[in-house]
């Protein structure tokens, strides 16, 4: 969670969206739009438009900002990264409708980024929609080039592991932290 007034990172946004069930291409599409709207700043505020200005990562205005405020008791620009991503992923009628419209056509990160710009952000600038699509494609490419680690499983308590070859088992165990002893195995 980015500190108040501080920017989140692109990775915080992409990983946060993936954790909420979005694909890499969908997450990249949304992250690209957030980059162009607020440069990943959860506290971003623009006093113009919507009667109350534009707030937060998505620069929500008017009814959308008020719906956020009704749900969380504060405007988006006063909320955390997680609260804003939760709202994007929520079943709020307008958020869900806009999100479904943006993702309905499917496609590449570029196509989704363009669609999120046109159908979720709805600023009406076709050239900007395309630019955001290009940014989404670049984000997806960066993310897909990162080495992926398997699912991390945290285990507490005594554990008995049986393996035919303890050396192979040891190659698959990764020490995350602490003073856990991995030097015993039952054969």
Please describe what each predicted stretch is.
Residues 1-7, 32-33, 48, 97, ...:
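G/A/S/T/P/Q/N-biased, glycine-rich low-complexity segments that form flexible N-terminal tails, linkers
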Residues 3-20, 28, 35-106:
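Peptidoglycan-targeting cell-wall enzymes and recognition modules
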Residues 9-13, 26-30, 81-84, 88-91, ...:
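Stable alpha-helical elements in mature extracytoplasmic
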Residues 23, 144-187:
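C-terminal, disordered and strongly charge-biased linear tails with low hydrophobicity
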Residues 34-38, 103-126:
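Acidic helix/loop microenvironments that form the catalytic cleft of cell-wall polysaccharide enzymes
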Residues 57, 113, 152:
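A residue-level signal for beta-strand positions that form part of recognition/binding surfaces
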Residues 70-76, 130-132, 166-176:
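Short, polar loop/linker segments at the starts of domains and inter-domain junctions
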Residues 123-144:
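Long, amphipathic alpha-helical surface segments
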